[in-house]
Amino acid sequence: MQQEIELILHHMHVENIVETGTRKFYVGTIQKKKCVVSLSRIGKVASSVTAAVMIERFAVDRLIVTGVAGGLTDEVKIGDIVVATSSVQHDMDCRPIFPQFEIPLLDVVTFTCDTTLVEDAYKSCSTFIREELHDFVSKNELQALHIHQPAVHKGLLVSGDQFIGTMPQYEKIRAELPDAIFVEMEGAAVAQVCYEYKVPLVVVRSISDKANAIAHIDFNRYIENVAKYYTWGLIEGMMK
């Protein structure tokens, strides 16, 4: 969502805006470090295109994917942050030709995120939650969204071209990929692109829902008043 990158762009010194493939790529610096920022768009194909352009045209040497996701375990609550250590495309199924979840012709099921980026992201998010969150988001706003004591987690991400918001969808993923702790629609696809190009990646998401139709919040309010500050806190910390 555009709101999720607005705060990054506000703090970024934008030197150039490149438009290609119906996308805008903001080129410049954050805290004097060169970077490129773009809206990935929604879904596996859209985000893969964005990632490929980042790598091919702008020669980025690492990628950070941020945004929101659905939680898949009791421990991962709305308002928490999750850093992916690895990812799987939960809707990839070419059986009987290839095993379920395996990417055809790559012989890969699980894409591992860069360990250094994972640790940097985890530390940045933990510092933000512990020391800076209330500078951006009031306790009253957090309480209104039923966010009480945000935590940071690390674990398996699953991605697919469908919004997971019903109990049958939720239970299917939990049964087939029991180690997964959060779900969204882009990260594992970008991970495949980064795997093929050998570019380090980390995926970091804040939890906006429980992916099971039970716990709901005002999504737009969450994005506008909470999630975008999480995103900026992550980026600011990793750019230090």
Q: For the regions a protein language model found, what residue spans apply to each?
A:
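N-terminal short beta-loop-beta anion/metal-coordinating cradle
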Residues: M1-A52, F58
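Active-site-proximal beta-strand elements of phosphoester/diester hydrolases
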Residues: V36-S40, K154-V158, V204
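Glycine-rich phosphate-binding loop signature in dinucleotide/nucleotide-binding domains
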Residues: M54-D61, Y197-V199
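Structural motif
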Residues: R62-I64, I181
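Mid-sequence, gly/pro-rich, charge-dense loop/helix-turn segments that line enzyme active sites
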Residues: T73-L177
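A C-terminal functional module that forms or caps the active site or interfaces directly
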Residues: V158-A213
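His/Asp/Glu-rich mid-to-C-terminal helical/loop segments that flank catalytic regions of hydrolases
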Residues: A211-K240
